[in-house]
């Protein structure tokens, strides 16, 4: 009797052709720089293509207590349905010799 719910879940994925990782395939990942720190783990991020988005911290970054500060370079995950909001999934290590980082930091606003 306990196998019936598991069988229903498996049949659902077989019938509708959905997998657990299928939703992650549609996401867009872009580099950006933190321009403003908002409340509750929200940040305003300027992407390398010039767009500005509001992004929140992913769960893994919260659990590992990774600090994200103003001017940090990050990777933001965007949904194709709403390109104004995103999730910060990685903080890039700072490099002093990178001219790209300096260019981003001078144009924060």
From Swiss-Prot:
SMART domains: eIF1a (SM00652), S1 (SM00316)
GO molecular function: ribosome binding; rRNA binding; translation initiation factor activity
Domain spans labelled S1-like: 18-93
InterPro entries the UniProt entry points to: NA-bd_OB-fold, RNA-binding_domain_S1_IF1, S1_domain, TIF_eIF-1A, TIF_IF1
Subcellular location: Plastid, Chloroplast
GO CC aspect terms: chloroplast; cytosol
UniProt KW keywords: Chloroplast, Initiation factor, Plastid, Protein biosynthesis, RNA-binding, rRNA-binding
Gene3D superfamilies cross-referenced by the UniProt entry: Nucleic acid-binding proteins
Source organism superkingdom: Eukaryota
Any Pfam family the entry gives: eIF-1a
NCBIfam families: infA
Similarity section: Belongs to the IF-1 family.
Assembly information from the UniProt record: Component of the 30S ribosomal translation pre-initiation complex which assembles on the 30S ribosome in the order IF-2 and IF-3, IF-1 and N-formylmethionyl-tRNA(fMet); mRNA recruitment can occur at any time during PIC assembly.
Biological role: One of the essential components for the initiation of protein synthesis. Stabilizes the binding of IF-2 and IF-3 on the 30S subunit to which N-formylmethionyl-tRNA(fMet) subsequently binds. Helps modulate mRNA selection, yielding the 30S pre-initiation complex (PIC). Upon addition of the 50S ribosomal subunit IF-1, IF-2 and IF-3 are released leaving the mature 70S translation initiation complex.
Protein name: Translation initiation factor IF-1, chloroplastic
Source species of the chain: Tupiella akineta
Gene (UniProt): infA
């Amino acid at each position: 009797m306990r196998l019936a719910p598991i069988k229903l879940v498996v049949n659902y994925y077989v019938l509708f052709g959905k997998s657990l990782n299928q939703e992650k395939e549609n996401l867009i990942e872009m580099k950006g720089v933190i321009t403003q720190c908002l409340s509750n783990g929200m940040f305003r991020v300027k992407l390398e293509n010039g767009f500005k988005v509001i992004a929140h911290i992913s769960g893994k970054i919260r659990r590992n207590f990774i600090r994200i500060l103003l001017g940090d370079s990050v990777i933001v995950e965007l949904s194709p349905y709403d390109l104004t909001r995103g999730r910060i999934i990685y903080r890039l290590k700072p490099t002093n010799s990178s001219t790209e980082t300096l260019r981003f930091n001078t144009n924060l606003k």
